[in-house]
Amino acid sequence: ILLQKVQLPLGATCIDVGTGAGFPGMVLALLRPDLQVTLLDSLQKRIGFLEQTAAKLGLANVRCIHARAEDGAKLPELREQFDMATARAVAAMPVLTEYCLPFVKQGGVFAAMKGPSETAEQAETAAKLLGGEIVGEESYTLPTAGERKLIRIRKTAPTPQKYPRRSDKIKKQ
């Protein structure tokens, strides 16, 4: 559903924030070898596993980075560099939007794959503050996991430099 709802040009850049075991980032790299996919995770052990997996699968289009989202989004080589950022169960939508939208360049999309109780409306204030606008919310069903949602936010303006904040500051709101 992700590649159906987010049309990415040839050679597009993607970052999977809080990738965990590499889903959906590794799958995107397999399905679209033209994409340049960055897998970002805060646990070095996971990054090591993903590097080995990408090497065994011959995925030259995968780069693995060990960093927390709020730190990685401050790095010039990652900030506002991606056509698409994606994430799954990292945090609630307002927090996840603050973590992910700073990675997306203007005109790009943040695509959140969330559970059935999450809504685009929950991220609307954060999206506006961070230079984005809600462009879609679709429900879909996974055979073994039930109903899910894909929430899409288009980046329309640069994210102010103070974002993302440290996780303890974000979660206090």
Briefly describe each language-model feature range.
Residues 51, 97-101, 123-125:
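Short amphipathic alpha-helical segments
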Residues 36, 61-63, 109, 133-136:
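Conserved beta-strand segments of alpha/beta enzyme cores
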Residues 70, 92, 115-119:
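Short "lid" loop at the C-terminus of a central beta-strand within the Rossmann-like core
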Residues 1-91, 97:
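Conserved SAM/SAH cofactor-binding pocket of Class I
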Residues 121-173:
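SAM/dcSAM-binding transferase cores
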Residues 107-117:
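Conserved beta-strand signature within the Rossmann-like core of class I S-adenosyl-L-methionine
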Residues 44, 116-118, 142-143:
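Conserved nucleotide-binding/hydrolysis micro-motifs of P-loop NTPases
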Residues 32, 104-106:
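Helix-to-beta-strand junctions that scaffold the AdoMet/dcAdoMet cofactor pocket
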